[in-house]
From Swiss-Prot:
Source lineage: Eukaryota, Metazoa, Ecdysozoa, Nematoda, Chromadorea
Signal peptide: none
Subcellular location: Mitochondrion
The protein's name in its UniProt record: Uncharacterized protein F13E9.13, mitochondrial
SUPFAM superfamilies tied to this protein: Ribulose-phoshate binding barrel
């Protein structure tokens, strides 16, 4: 089996790798859109530059401002806009931190579209929803997609792109899988060829459960990332994780909707660089 670059880096790092979030401004056609694409892309590039200059290990672009979300497939203007945003991210990486990792998530659950964008823009991974098992989200019922998504990756010859999947994901109801533990779900994600899993709290900015992380990490040689609620105060508590995905804590006032705060990013990275897994 191919071990993708990002997977190798996560498993072999002496500390959790840090991935900063770029919450792309609301895109054309969505209710909150106010900016032209030129302004959206300028903001994406500016935030990417801030992240890479502060030494984060990777950056993820996500269309989080496109509320309310809709089920896949994503519409053409969303996919093309996210491709342009991803291109800005990759160009920033190449200019400031060539060794850094880049990823994408397209909401909601537009995993095939995210994979296509990652492939065409030269990114390293996608964050997927609904990879194994089903759940109920704000936008409705989300089906598991592992079989189709991995066949699509094979058809693109995009085996270099990793797929990290949320399990028991935030902003969702999981009563339909209440008899499946998060440990079992992680095992099934690995069995179905995910490259790693993401553990979150109940909502954006909410801390994950330490006990759930411990249970998931019993799956050997399988990256576990914490996908919400990480900050300078609790990073040490989750130090055994392979990666941190940080959005809210890197923003002014710790609010995900706000602009990036370079000082908060710098302070966090200095702290994380003292940690040892």
């Amino acid at each position: 089996m191919v071990q993708r670059v990002v997977v190798s880096k996560l498993l072999n790092s002496s500390r959790p790798l840090v991935f900063g979030m770029i919450h792309v401004p609301a895109l054309p056609g969505t209710p909150s859109n106010t900016l032209p694409m030129s302004a959206i892309l300028k903001k994406v590039r500016k935030e990417a530059d801030v992240y890479f200059k502060n030494g984060v290990d990777g950056v993820i672009v996500e269309n989080m401002h496109d509320v309310p979300y809709v089920k896949p497939p994503a519409s053409p203007e969303i996919v093309s806009s996210m491709a342009l945003a991803s291109d800005q991210l990759v160009k920033s990486r190449d200019a400031h931190h060539p060794a850094a990792l880049t990823g994408i998530q397209i909401l909601a659950a537009a995993n095939r579209e995210a994979l296509a964008v990652a492939y065409t823009t030269g990114m390293d991974f996608i964050r997927a929803e609904g990879f194994v098992y089903s759940h109920v989200a704000d936008e409705g019922w989300i089906d598991g997609c592992a079989g189709g998504l991995l066949r699509y990756r094979s058809s693109l010859k995009a085996e270099n792109i990793a797929i990290f999947t949320d399990i028991k994901k935030k902003h969702s109801a999981h009563s339909v899988t209440s008899d499946v533990s998060i440990h079992e779900m992680a095992k099934d994600a690995k069995f179905n060829c995910a490259d790693g899993v993401i553990v979150t709290g109940s909502a954006t900015g909410s801390a994950a459960s330490l006990e759930e992380m411990i249970q998931v990490m019993k799956v050997q040689e399988f990256p576990v990332l914490i996908g919400s609620g990480i900050n300078g105060k609790n990073a040490r508590e989750f130090v055994k994780a392979h990666g941190f995905i940080v959005g809210s804590d890197f923003k002014i006032g710790g609010e995900w909707k706000n602009d990036l705060d370079s000082g908060r990013i710098s302070k966090f990275m200095k702290h994380v660089n003292t940690l040892k897994r």
